[in-house]
């Protein structure tokens, strides 16, 4: 079975659209330095490793051959090198010098004072024509020139994958114009670890709250082989959320109570070795958008942040690297 489905719409008042794994938005620094992000959010608990990451360096590439040098160096997408751990910075500089010397290129690395905020990376990348950059090692894509004054439909094409794998999205696209495609330009890859992609205005992402509840409330959900046993022990009802049949838990709890119940469930699960997933869900924009995703027949949801609308969609293919292409009409207008 083949078909095209509308997943929803996005609105991008800034004209700069970011494509990122929605599960990683807790790492997005917005207008702040990435050094302000707690290494614990990266899964780093060792204090020495945390200090190394917190002291990381961003490098700008300067010199007449800068563009060629950074591209052929091949360490990262984009025109800069980001998030180089402090212990590796000197080694990267030395390797770059060797590379330029061997290739006869005139370029050098210069440390960016205070690091480059993620929102600044996106805007600069868009100004340079669009493309990819890294956010703590995760590939992200930014594109500029997106219409600012209207909602843009997000479409997905579905095809049968074969061999019993069922139907999956073959592509997801945002239509910014109606002209015929004259050329295509690869922009880079999105790195996905949470099976979802988010399309968002760069300014809207700067006010995104990933885990902080906007109303002081949270949900606790659990499911799996031991869910019935846990529900009886903890007196948990059906969660009652659309698209989550068989999931147990509580909705709209005060944050301290929700944390207490989630931790109690996790301790019971881990202490007994039972098979069950426990999900703590603060009422944040991330919770709102994922609530829509879980209830959606097409695995997509959206949330308004100011004048912007951001959309999150499940990939239908799990995790991986997903290429992004700008299809241009004869005037050079794009449709990422």
What are these regions (language model features)?
Residues 295-336:
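C-terminal structured interaction module
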């Amino acid at each position: 079975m083949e078909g095209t489905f509308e997943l929803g719409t996005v609105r991008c008042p800034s004209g700069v659209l970011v494509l990122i794994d929605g599960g990683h938005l807790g790492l997005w620094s917005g207008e702040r330095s990435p050094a302000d992000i707690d290494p614990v959010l990266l899964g780093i608990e060792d204090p020495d490793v945390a200090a190394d990451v917190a002291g990381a360096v961003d490098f700008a590439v300067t010199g007449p051959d800068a563009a060629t040098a950074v591209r052929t160096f091949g360490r990262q997408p984009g025109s800069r090198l980001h998030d180089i751990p402090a212990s590796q910075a000197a080694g990267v500089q030395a390797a770059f010098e060797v590379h330029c010397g061997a290739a006869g290129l005139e370029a050098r690395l210069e440390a960016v004072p205070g690091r480059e905020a993620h929102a600044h990376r996106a805007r600069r990348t868009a100004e340079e024509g669009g493309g990819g950059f890294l956010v703590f090692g995760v590939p992200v894509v930014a594109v500029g020139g997106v219409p600012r004054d209207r909602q843009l439909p997000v479409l997905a094409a579905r095809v049968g994958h074969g061999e019993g794998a069922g139907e999956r999205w073959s592509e997801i696209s945002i239509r910014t114009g109606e002209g015929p495609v004259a050329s295509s330009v690869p922009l880079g890859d999105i790195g996905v670890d949470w099976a979802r992609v988010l399309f968002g205005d760069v300014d809207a992402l700067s006010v995104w709250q990933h885990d902080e509840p906007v109303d002081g409330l949270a949900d606790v959900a659990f499911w799996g082989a031991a869910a019935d046993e846990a529900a009886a022990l903890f007196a948990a009802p059906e969660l009652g959320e659309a698209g989550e049949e068989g999931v147990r838990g509580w909705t709209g709890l005060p944050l301290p109570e929700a944390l207490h119940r989630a931790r109690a469930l996790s301790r019971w699960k881990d202490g007994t070795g039972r098979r069950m997933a426990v999900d703590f869900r603060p009422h944040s924009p991330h919770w709102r958008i994922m609530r829509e995703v879980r209830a959606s027949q097409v695995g997509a949801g959206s949330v308004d942040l100011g004048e912007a609308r951001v959309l999150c969609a499940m990939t239908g293919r799990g995790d991986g690297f997903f290429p992004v292409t700008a299809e241009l009409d004869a005037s050079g207008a794009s449709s990422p």
